Amino acid sequence: QPNLWRCEKDEEFVNCAPRCPQNCRNIRSYQPCLVLTPVCAPGCVCRSGKVKNDRGDCVSITDCFK
């Protein structure tokens, strides 16, 4: 992981992060991805089984519905 990327505790660095990753908001109600290019970019993503909540914290998907 390059030094310029400081991922949080529940995140990991990937070379190809999706431009419109799943999060609590788009899991609860469909929202189309409006970012057309590039397809992906390096960055931090939530670890497996977790998504970002409205505050930007990685939480389990079930927590999105609480």
Curated annotation (Swiss-Prot):
Q: What is its main location?
A: secreted
Cross-referenced Pfam families, in alphabetical order? TIL
Record keywords, A-Z:
Disulfide bond, Protease inhibitor, Secreted, Serine protease inhibitor
Q: In which tissues is it expressed?
A: Expressed by the venom gland.
Q: Spell out the molecular function terms from Gene Ontology.
A: serine-type endopeptidase inhibitor activity
Q: Where in the cell is it found?
A: Secreted
Work out whether the entry's keyword set contains Secreted: yes
- Limits of the TIL domain: 7-64
Question: Is Lipoprotein one of the keywords UniProt gives this record?
Answer: no
Q: Which GO terms describe its cellular component?
A: extracellular region
Instruction: Please give the InterPro entries that the UniProt record associates with this protein.
Output: Ser_inhib-like_sf, TIL_dom
Cross-referenced SUPFAM superfamilies, in alphabetical order? Answer: Serine protease inhibitors
Cysteine-cysteine disulfides: C7-C44, C16-C40, C20-C33, C24-C64, C46-C58
- Of which family is this protein a member? Belongs to the serine protease inhibitor-like (TIL domain-containing) family.
Function recorded in the entry: Serine protease inhibitor.
Q: What is this protein called?
A: Venom peptide CtAPI
